[in-house]
UniProtKB/Swiss-Prot annotation:
It is found in: Cytoplasm; Nucleus. Involved in proper assembly of pre-ribosomal particles during the biogenesis of the 60S ribosomal subunit. Accompanies the pre-60S particles to the cytoplasm. This is Ribosome biogenesis protein ALB1. Residues 1-56 are annotated as: Disordered. GO terms for cellular component: cytoplasm; nucleus. The gene is ALB1. The lineage of its organism: Eukaryota, Fungi, Dikarya, Ascomycota, Saccharomycotina. Component of the nucleoplasmic and cytoplasmic pre-60S ribosomal particles. GO terms for biological process: ribosome biogenesis. Keywords: Cytoplasm, Nucleus, Ribosome biogenesis, Transport. Belongs to the ALB1 family. It holds the Pfam family Alb1.
Length: 168
């Protein structure tokens, strides 16, 4: 006698057989009476008269400009989802390229401005007097001193600063 959890119990076998046969009868009745659909035909049957499923996606043919001169027919297709994704990516690429072109033009304009300022500085340097040159050197020294910031002299042992022992 089979165990309590066995799948080979006679009662379970009878129930499974009757269930499978009733489903098979319903399927064959639908095939005889109803419209032929993809769900009512076997998976690998290539019946062109079968109506498409409600959830079946519509494919879009993929064309890349001119046709190939070899005359070979290619049946590459795209789903709606994939075609929308490609269109969206093309839009993003176009925006990015436009932004890069704007940046490139701005850089070129800035380079032109730099060339003009260099010419102005050269003409200004030619017209400077000795007094102007001395003023420029002194102001450069002051700016260098200010940009160095505050220097803390730590002494020899570093006491009283955070460099040595932290005792206040």
């Amino acid at each position: 006698m089979p165990s309590r959890n066995s799948i080979n119990k006679p009662k379970d076998k009878l129930q499974r057989n009757s269930h499978a046969s009733s489903i098979g009868k319903k399927r064959s009745a639908r095939a005889r009476n109803g419209i032929v659909t993809k769900s009512s035909t076997p998976r690998y049957e290539t019946d062109s008269n079968a109506a498409p499923k409600a959830t079946e996606s519509k494919a879009i043919a993929l064309y890349n400009g001119a046709t190939t001169p070899t005359g070979v027919i290619i049946n590459n297709t795209l789903s709606n989802k994939r075609s929308k994704k490609i269109a969206r990516n093309k839009k993003y690429i176009a925006k990015r390229n436009e932004k890069l072109n704007i940046d490139l033009l701005a850089d070129q304009e800035q380079m032109e401005v730099d060339e003009e300022t260099e010419k102005e500085e050269q003409t200004k340097a030619k017209n400077q007097t000795k007094l102007d040159k001395i003023k420029e050197v002194l102001w450069a020294a002051v700016e260098d001193r200010v940009s160095e910031g505050l220097k803390v002299s730590s002494g020899t042992d570093g006491n009283g600063t955070t460099l040595g022992v932290q005792a206040f």
